[in-house]
Amino acid sequence: MFALRTFAVLFASLSALAAATPLDARTNPTTTVTVTAPASTATVPAGQCNVSNQQCCNSVEKASSGPAALVLGLLGVVVQDVNVLVGLDCSPITVIGGGNGACNASPVCCENNSFGSLISIGCIPISL
């Protein structure tokens, strides 16, 4: 009988403790991104961009625009300069692989702030 009461008290105590534990800190981490490239709509030659940073993006927008802000929010990314350009749905521009360095969308040079091919932060348009 004593063991049953001890178990009941222990179970009730642990249940109350689990219910009082906040989940927000574990489930919603944020990432702050500081972009060193200025927000620019000027086009620069591809030769001024590191080859590994050249991207072909389906859309290039300011971080404050609707689609970009939505993706950044869902990823938990906070961009300090909301006027910085971000590329959405990007892929690397490479000569290897038969692409001949071509881009049928928006060629940009982005900092190494990317989240897969979903979004690249700190982009500047380039001319190929």
From Swiss-Prot:
Top-level lineage group: Eukaryota
Keyword Disulfide bond: yes
Disulphide bond pairs: 49-109, 56-103, 57-90, 110-123
InterPro entries referenced in this protein's UniProt entry, alphabetically: Hydrophobin
Record carries keyword Membrane: no
The entry's keywords: Cell wall, Disulfide bond, Glycoprotein, Secreted, Signal
Main localisation: secreted
Signal peptide per UniProt: 1-20
Residues glycosylated per entry: 50, 112
Induction, per UniProt: Expression is negatively regulated by the basidioma development repressor lfc1. A CT-rich motif, which is often found immediately upstream of the transcription start point of highly expressed filamentous fungal genes, is present at the expected position.
MF-aspect GO terms: structural constituent of cell wall
Family as reported in the entry's similarity comment: Belongs to the fungal hydrophobin family.
Name recorded for this polypeptide: Class I hydrophobin 8
Taxonomic placement: Eukaryota, Fungi, Dikarya, Basidiomycota, Agaricomycotina
